[in-house]
């Protein structure tokens, strides 16, 4: 089957937003106008096309990025719906990796909200071009100018409107296009009938002023345009469009549009802007990977059908009908269903059963995928999130995705024997889908422990076990992932010697332990001179230290951010062995625990709380009572925002407490920021508890 849409006419976009900015409704309307849906589903009734997992429908939030394909004005638009809740920022990061552009949706009353900032930062890290859609213009208190100002003040973004609304709240009735200086008026409720009219006289001055500001903002990124602008020359519509497109693609400028998805206004114009200003796979920098056989050698995956096949798996899902679905983005080359591919990340050969193009909750079988496409494959057994798929002769790895370690853990127990096996299967499948979710069995207690990125994250996973896998389980109290580290340096000896008839065991090491920089992890240095410890035993010393560090020295938590320098030791020709040196290294660590001033570290969360000013005193008091450190405050519209660092152990149940402190008017987001030392009195309690005292 030949290519249906050329690369120039392909757009891979994501829709990013704060939790209640109307992202899902916006996606819905895109699907409605591109002819993919016949009836519109409202999120607040729990029946949206993109939110296809039951939990999402219950909670009215979007959790998994479903990939949907739609067509508009002769172009293919692949939409990846990204989650808007901060516990799911890994999902967002993962989908940003495969996008070429994004639409950031703002609430016209609130402007840029805390979660918008988080997602915006991530998009900037990955260099994703964006356009901004100021949604909910029909809402009470909607203020377009204020929303645009928050882009400047809170995100320092070079953003300018390419549209202006006429009216707001109930009076919102038309949109002025500042590029072409036209006006569009909506004449029916479904927003399918649009009338192009002249810009009303009383709005002309405002429109001309806004157009001049737009040209000025774009001219900063284009020398040609700047010359014309300074020389008062006429700038044509096509020149302005091209300059906006260039600046947007280079992530130097962000066009701002307006509308209300719920009331069906402005969505088609936003789709036009996606086509006009967001890049095709040919316009963005080609992705650079490296050779599996030689990590130093860079390889470029060029958007070209005739190139070697290379794709990145960005999402794994379990579908009740077809089993495991692997969503992937093709960067170069083509692939047909039934063919074999290589998973270069894991070094395995995989057979692609069927290829599916996904609509939010229905699917269409296809024969071939081309570069720039996003599709799902059935039949890939070993491929996980972040793996590279490539042609059998190719051995490119498209930079591995690195995922943060879980910061919160819970114990889960099946309610009955029948649930036991089902729970094991469920946990395996959920870990395949979500690399930030970990499950293991505690060796000492035999309990199954699950770990994730926040309370909501784990709540939803437990909920999914119940709904999708019919597993009833009891959930224990949340546990924090503490760590341990050394605060001072020391030189210690670890000696293991055992004689019990026949061959003995002998290993002797002298190691200098010093604190490492925060976040630098464990570093091992071999400084042995003259072979006092033979070379073949050095890896055993390092392995022995790593094993011992896993169980810490104070309360059984992993020891992190430590340097170990092996500088002396001795061995025995007959009795020395790898095992003996492993044990000697662990004895050295025990010795270091007495001299290196070990401390317990706890995860500190960056918490952003937004609430009406009158609750400020209560909230500040509450943050302090949770051992929090306030890092700054700022007014945001008619609300106040408090930024603070608070230990995770003090944040359990915070949602309920914030609700009661602010009569339900406060919101907060939090994510892991760094590890910090635990106060002595609390550390003593943790040690006692872990020793069962």
Curated annotation (Swiss-Prot):
Keywords: Cytoplasm, Elongation factor, GTP-binding, Nucleotide-binding, Protein biosynthesis. Transmembrane segments: none annotated. GO terms for molecular function: GTP binding; GTPase activity; translation elongation factor activity. The keyword Nucleotide-binding applies. Residues 8-282 form the tr-type G domain. Its main location: cytoplasm. PROSITE patterns: G_TR_1, G_TR_2. One of its GO terms (biological process) is ribosome disassembly. It is found in: Cytoplasm. GO terms for cellular component: cytoplasm. GTP binds at residues 17-24, 81-85, 135-138. InterPro entries: EFG_II, EFG_III, EFG_III/V, EFG_IV, EFG_V, EFG_V-like, EFTu-like_2, G_TR_CS. Catalyzes the GTP-dependent ribosomal translocation step during translation elongation. During this step, the ribosome changes from the pre-translocational (PRE) to the post-translocational (POST) state as the newly formed A-site-bound peptidyl-tRNA and P-site-bound deacylated tRNA move to the P and E sites, respectively. Catalyzes the coordinated movement of the two tRNA molecules, the mRNA and conformational changes in the ribosome. Has vitronectin-binding activity. Belongs to the TRAFAC class translation factor GTPase superfamily. Classic translation factor GTPase family. EF-G/EF-2 subfamily. This is Elongation factor G.
């Amino acid at each position: 089957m030949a290519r249906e849409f050329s690369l120039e006419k392909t757009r891979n976009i994501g829709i990013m937003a704060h939790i209640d900015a109307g992202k899902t409704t916006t996606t819905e309307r895109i699907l409605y106008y591109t002819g993919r849906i016949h009836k519109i589903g409202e999120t607040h009734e729990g029946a949206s096309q993109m939110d296809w997992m039951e939990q999402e429908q219950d909670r009215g939030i979007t959790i998994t990025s479903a990939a949907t394909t739609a067509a508009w004005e002769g172009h293919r638009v692949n939409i990846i719906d990204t989650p808007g809740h901060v516990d799911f920022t890994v999902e967002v990061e993962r989908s940003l990796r495969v996008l070429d552009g994004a639409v950031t949706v703002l609430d016209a009353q609130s402007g840029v909200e805390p979660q918008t900032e988080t997602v915006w930062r991530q998009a900037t890290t990955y260099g994703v071009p964006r356009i901004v859609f100021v949604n909910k213009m029909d809402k009470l208190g909607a203020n377009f100018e204020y929303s645009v100002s928050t882009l400047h003040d809170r995100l320092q973004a070079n953003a300018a409107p390419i549209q202006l609304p006429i009216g707001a709240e109930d009076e919102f009735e038309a949109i002025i296009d500042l590029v072409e200086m036209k006006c569009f008026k909506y004449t029916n409720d479904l927003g399918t009938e649009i009338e192009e009219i002249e810009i009303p006289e009383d709005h002309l001055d405002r429109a001309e002023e806004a157009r001049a500001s737009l040209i000025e903002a774009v001219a900063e990124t284009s020398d040609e345009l700047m010359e014309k602008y300074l020389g008062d020359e006429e700038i044509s519509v096509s020149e302005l469009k091209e300059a906006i497109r260039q600046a947007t693609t280079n992530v130097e400028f962000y066009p701002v549009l307006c509308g209300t998805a719920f009331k069906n206004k402005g969505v088609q114009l936003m789709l036009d802007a996606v086509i006009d200003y967001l890049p095709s796979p040919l316009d963005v920098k080609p992705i650079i990977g490296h050779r599996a056989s030689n990590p130093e050698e860079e390889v470029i995956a060029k958007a070209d059908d005739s190139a070697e096949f290379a794709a990145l798996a960005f999402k794994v899902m379990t579908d009740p009908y077809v089993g495991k679905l692997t969503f992937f983005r093709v960067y170069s080359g083509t692939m047909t269903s039934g063919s074999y591919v290589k998973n270069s990340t894991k070094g395995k050969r995989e057979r692609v059963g069927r290829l599916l193009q996904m609509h939010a909750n229905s699917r269409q079988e296809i024969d071939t995928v081309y570069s720039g496409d996003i599709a799902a494959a059935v039949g890939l057994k070993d491929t996980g999130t972040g793996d590279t798929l490539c042609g059998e002769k190719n051995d490119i790895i498209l930079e591995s995705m690195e995922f943060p370690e879980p910061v919160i853990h819970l114990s889960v127990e099946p309610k009955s024997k029948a649930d036991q096996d089902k729970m094991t299967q469920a946990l395996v499948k959920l870990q395949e889908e979500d690399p930030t979710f970990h499950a293991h069995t505690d060796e000492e207690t035999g309990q199954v422990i699950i770990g994730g990125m926040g309370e909501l994250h784990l709540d939803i996973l437990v909920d999914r076990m119940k709904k999708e896998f019919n597993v009833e389980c009891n959930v224990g109290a949340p546990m924090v992932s503490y760590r341990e580290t050394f605060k001072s340096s020391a030189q210690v000896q670890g000696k293991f010697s055992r004689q019990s008839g026949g061959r003995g065991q002998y290993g002797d090491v002298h190691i200098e332990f010093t604190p490492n920089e925060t976040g630098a992890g464990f570093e091992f240095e071999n400084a042995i001179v003259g072979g006092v410890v033979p070379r073949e035993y050095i890896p055993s010393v390092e392995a022995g230290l790593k094993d011992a560090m896993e169980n810490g020295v104070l309360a059984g938590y992993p020891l992190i951010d430590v340097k170990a320098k092996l500088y002396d030791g001795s061995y025995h020709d007959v009795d020395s062995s790898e095992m003996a040196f492993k044990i000697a290294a662990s004895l050295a660590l025990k010795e270091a625990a007495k001299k290196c001033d070990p401390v317990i570290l706890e995860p500190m969360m960056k918490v952003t709380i937004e609430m009406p000013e009158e609750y400020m005193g209560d909230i500040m008091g509450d943050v302090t009572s949770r051992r929090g450190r306030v890092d700054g405050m700022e007014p945001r519209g008619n609300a106040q925002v408090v930024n603070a660092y608070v230990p995770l152990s003090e944040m359990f149940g915070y949602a309920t407490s914030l609700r009661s402190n602010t009569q339900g008017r406060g919101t907060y987001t939090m994510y892991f920021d760094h590890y910090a030392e635990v106060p002595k009195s609390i550390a003593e309690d943790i040690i006692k508890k872990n020793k069962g005292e």
